[in-house]
Amino acid sequence: MMESKFSTEAIEYLEQHIDELLNDLSELVAIPSVRDLTTQTENAPFGYQIRQAFDYLIKFAEREGLEVRDHQGYALDISFGQGDQEIALLHHVDVVPAGDEMLWRTPPYRMTKIDNMVFGRGVTDNKGPLIASLYILKLFKQLTVPLNKKIRVIIGGAEETTWECVEHYFQHNPQPEYGFSPDGDFPIVNGEKGILYASLGKQFSARSSDSACQIRRIESERDRTSTCHFLVLELAGSSAEKVAHQFAAFADVIDCQSHYRVEISTPWEKSRNPHKVDNSMDKFVNIMRHVEGLDPNSASLVHLLDSHFANDYVGHKLGLYHNDDEMGYTTCCVSAINMDSHGYNLDFDFRFPKGLSIERVRSQLLALSQQAGVNFVEHQYLPLSYLSPESALIQAMGKAYSDVTGTDANCFSKGAASYARALEHGVAFGPTFPEEVTFVHEPNEQLNLESLIKAITIYVKVLISLQE
């Protein structure tokens, strides 16, 4: 009864205050809160702009009479309610760079409303949902909703990069009874695959200059969140012209007199979805594997890629393929390849479901690297998360989602990383509904306002039901 009553009042409140919510979101979007360690200070470990975003949220909390705590610039929490037990909503204030602003239909850091959509960097990932959660605290306070469990909004500053924020937070604060991260999809993401970001590299002791074909240089952007979508190589030697023109059907080939420059471009895609697009690494290997007279150092790179990564998105060639009935199969993505006269390096991420341990993954990759004569470097590991569909949290979420949408709340798993995996008892839950397009991490990131209000209504129902 209480849930139904306050859900109705919440919708009315949101409809009356939507312009105010959008104004607060607009001010937060205007802060380009991208990690920048060149502006790092004692209370701004992730740089000036992320500190500015935190300061804006502190002012918001003080304005609304909400309890706020600053955790040395790593994270904030803003809360409302009483009781020893807590329910947490986990968000982040950092964003990925806007990229080429010419590809945006609106300025990325000036939120723009067109019909029922708003555009801007972070409107979906994750500033829009963050402001929505703060408005839930605000409406609970103004509607005097009786809460016997405190609701705490935890806000990190390094979700898009290193995750030091939540690591720092939970080193100094207890886990909540329940928690969820509105930084995913509906219905319920009850599983997130483990993620290992790593690289394989080799230093050259000598470089051959008399081979028929030499790869002088390979360049690609070191963005671990994407597939290898743009690759530049320089070819020299007596057969360089012949080899370069084999790429001409799908790449730009430029005669630079002393060498040939080949630019391979393929569609951008998130590294967790390597199966969705062609990638530049595969196109590079599919030509170079057949080249005779390739210099030994270049040949070792081509052989490494061909033997263990090329044309394989699920880890078969690594000897690590695994498929779980609930969480799906492993994925492997090479995100960048770079080589010069000193050596080469390839960055990759490997994602895996339950049933495959990180110890097994590390052991296999180390053995592979030793056999290939290359160095294996682990950059970051994010443990997998999984919560049983039978848990009280998921049961409450399922009921709220079905009540609001009239559809079943199915559980599913993703390769994505949300703060849900920092929780002992939590999942990712919205805000994006099935079939919605948000262009997260891309130009023209967008948020549907009707969907946002619907998501808030679902969250209100869940938070009230978990008070019992």
Regions found by a protein language model. Give the residues of each.
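Acidic, glycine-rich active-site loops and adjacent beta-strand->loop/helix elements
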Residues: 93-95, 151-162, 182-187, 222, ...
